[in-house]
């Protein structure tokens, strides 16, 4: 892998995925109770799903010809990983508004920016012919072909 010759879409997705991966181990929430303070990383609860989304987007950025944009199937997978991670981060942010908003830490905000970065990089730098419906159809076709191939003796 040569980072210099890597396609811009793949490069930005990979950078955002690595930033999100690192953010998962940084403090997300700082809890203070009777003078005792503790912090919690993102590797709890729904944060684990966000972690897998970052890994999935990073792996997809490495697959295939790295000098070209992602093909429809991989583009749709990267888009879905970014969208799912973004939705979970927004949900966690809304949930935190109930009381602990001031205690959110750098890891939470970095993970939110990284998930939005994956989503925006995948969508903004896509091929002009790529669409969400086309990506979903391509993914469905690939799954059907793999299923048919595994059923034949």
Predicted feature residues:
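Compact integral membrane and secretory-pathway proteins
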Residues: 1-153
């Amino acid at each position: 892998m040569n980072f210099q010759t890597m396609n811009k879409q793949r490069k930005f997705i990979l950078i955002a995925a690595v930033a999100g991966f690192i953010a998962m181990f940084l403090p997300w929430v700082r809890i203070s109770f009777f003078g005792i303070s503790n912090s919690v990383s993102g590797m709890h609860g729904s944060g684990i799903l966000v972690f897998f989304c970052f890994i999935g987007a990073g792996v997809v950025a490495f697959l295939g010809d790295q000098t070209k944009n992602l093909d429809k199937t991989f583009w749709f997978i990267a888009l879905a990983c970014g969208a799912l991670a973004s939705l979970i981060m927004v949900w966690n942010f809304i949930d935190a508004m109930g009381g602990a908003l001031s205690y959110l830490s750098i890891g939470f905000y970095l993970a939110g920016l990284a998930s939005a970065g994956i989503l925006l990089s995948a969508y903004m730098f896509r091929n002009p012919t790529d669409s969400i419906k086309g990506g979903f159809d391509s993914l469905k076709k690939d799954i059907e072909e793999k299923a048919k191939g595994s059923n034949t003796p």
